[in-house]
Amino acid sequence: AESEAAESVADTQTTEGGTITVAASATPHAEILEEAKKILADQGWDLEITIFDDYVLPNEVVESGEFDANYFQHIPYLENFNAEKGTHLVNAGGIHYEPFGIYPGTKKDLSELADGDTIAVPNDTTNEARALLLLQDNGIITLKDGAGLEATVNDIAENPHNVKIEELAAEQV
């Protein structure tokens, strides 16, 4: 996502370089940007990367013009953020595909899931739905008919393992 100020920078066809400020999550986004920083430096650009540990501030600092861009979110999250917060952020382009998975924690695999175990899911609208759909695809829960990309824990129709779904900030999951 980027602000109008960053859009004007992106539209400028200069080779003089300058500074680009980016708000990013630590992994993998800041790591990827560190590699891009080397390439940009060869072209006369200074990439300043600031790591944020939440999913709200990076959008707020771009919207305010304090940063040129951010790098941490997928398009559904960006669109939902704009709708909820009245912001005007835009997608500047895709960089990488971020897979979503189920990680068994202390278990070797999902077959060791026991009745009453706790499963953490992101608490933001788009990522929570993705997590719940993934749990459904793996037979852990069943969602109500029609629960799609806006599903919440309230849409769980069946929970045969009586797992506890704990909603946490995405960066904590």
Map each language-model feature to its residues:
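Ligand-binding "clamshell"
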Residues: 80-92, 107
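Short, polar/charged alpha-helical segment
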Residues: 26-48, 57
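Short, low-complexity disordered leader/linker segments with a strong preference
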Residues: 1-19, 42
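Short, well-ordered beta-strand elements
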Residues: 15-27, 45-51, 118-119
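Alpha-to-beta junction loops
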Residues: 63-73, 117, 140, 161-164
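Beta->alpha turn/N-cap motifs
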Residues: 27, 54-55, 65-79, 96, ...
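A conserved helix-loop-strand patch within extracytoplasmic ligand-binding domains
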Residues: 92-142
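Short helix-initiation/N-cap motifs at beta->coil->alpha
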Residues: 49-60, 147-173
